[in-house]
A protein has these predicted regions:
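Mature extracellular/passenger domains of Gram-negative fimbrial/pilin and adhesin proteins
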Residues: 2-6, 11, 35-189
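Residue-identity detector for glycine
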Residues: 13-15, 20
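Bacterial N-terminal signal peptides
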Residues: 20-29
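N-terminal signal peptide c-region/cleavage motif recognized by signal peptidases
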Residues: 31-33
Length: 189
């Protein structure tokens, strides 16, 4: 499968621990250059900051939700094309992406627009199954009127929801938590 454009996303957490347990968690997203003849993908911001966590307040057996973060995804193509994409990353459980050994994140595409008009997203091999969540191994295609639609510009808000296990927060030394992957535009046929 030919990759039209690639967007690399790295979810990286850096924890600094002292007498009061705290962690600064940051997500980094950046784009990889592509040739002029290909579609171009960009994100609105390269860094998503999860702020400071206090492990003593958050630790336990339950997963800790680190919040929702949103960035804007834009695809610009020189010619009208069917937009289909996936996110390639390490699967945590088939439905979420791994974030280190003890965390995970979900990606949801919200408010998708093709050439400025609202569209739907569906599984590439089953257009009847509408979806806005990008799960491991899944490819979504842009639909208008129930069929794959062609356009030159696509945009959507990418919501990143991240969780970390309570046990992972309750550590006493510097800890690095990493996870990531990349968006790919793929042929829709």
């Amino acid at each position: 499968m030919k990759e039209l454009r690639q967007l690399v996303a790295k979810v990286c957490g850096i924890g600094r621990y002292s007498s009061g347990i705290s962690a600064a968690l940051v997500s980094f997203l950046w784009a990889v250059e592509a040739s002029a003849a290909q579609c171009r993908i960009s994100l609105s911001q390269p860094v998503v900051d999860y702020g400071l966590l206090r492990g003593a307040e958050q630790s336990g057996s339950q997963d800790v939700f680190l919040g929702k973060r949103t960035v804007r995804l834009n695809v610009v193509c020189p010619e009208a094309t069917v937009i289909a994409m996936r996110f390639q990353g390490v699967s945590a459980d088939g439905q979420r992406y791994a974030w280190g050994r003890h965390g995970y994140f979900n990606l949801t595409l919200e408010h998708p627009l093709l050439d400025g008009r609202p569209v739907e997203l569906a599984h590439v091999h089953n257009h009847a199954t509408r979806s806005t969540g990008l799960q491991p191994g899944q490819t979504l295609v842009v639909l208008a009127g129930g069929v794959p639609a062609t356009g030159r510009t696509f945009s959507a808000q990418v919501q990143v929801d991240t969780w970390l296990s309570g046990a992972a927060i309750a550590v006493r030394s510097k800890t690095v938590v990493e996870g990531g992957g990349h968006f790919e535009l793929v042929p829709a046929g």
